[in-house]
Amino acid sequence: DRAPDLTLGTTPGPRVLGVDRSAGAGAAGGGTGGTSGGTSGGAPTCDASTTRRVSESRIGWGVKDSFRSYIRGSVAKGSWTTDGAVENGGAFIFSGAEGAVDTSGPRGTVAARGSVTFTGHGGTLRTVVADPEVTFSGGTGTLTADVTSNDTQGTPHAYGRIAVADLTVTASVDGGVLDGTAEATLTQAGANALSDFYEPGTVMSPVSVRAALAGAADCGALDGSGATGAGTAGSTPDVASLGALPADGSSAP
């Protein structure tokens, strides 16, 4: 599992964050160097003078290499499709123009739109991950998304908007552009929604985020939409039990 490069290959649109960095420094509060930023002691505060809205964004995430291998392997015999996102180098790239970043940290929220749908086992397995959002502050963060998964009977369960993964974030702002990468570990809600393929705390594919920053933003936008779903769907949809996984794990997620 590796972090996707959001500037190379096929991109969702005619340009990849077409930002004039030389002109953007003043508008976005200048650069923060290569540090991840953060606060110490208590909750972070918002500096309205350095808070900027997201005018264009990319979020890249591959879920997990072994999960994708399982979907297309001899057990699940499945595939995946995207809607409003593109596949690039083992990751799914979502695009948008939502969020806000305090460049003095940096901290904030970057949101994107689109979905990826995984299917397998003749359609019994079906998992949809949609509209991801990365919220970060002080080197930590959360990957939030809308997730729907089928149970072993093929009945869909809507988990709602949940915190899929906890993030360890490294981010910087330079010339009006936020660049960040994050290590991702699966939450309990994320494990439930991904059909219990992985235990909570499992290291997932890394997340990449890139955003062009423009004019002033409301400090309230820094926190994003947050997780509003319950993170459970009434039963454990143990779709992993559908396949007789080999002992060597070659086709296992």
Residue ranges, per PLM feature:
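Primarily mature extracellular domains of secreted and cell-surface proteins
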Residues: D1-P253
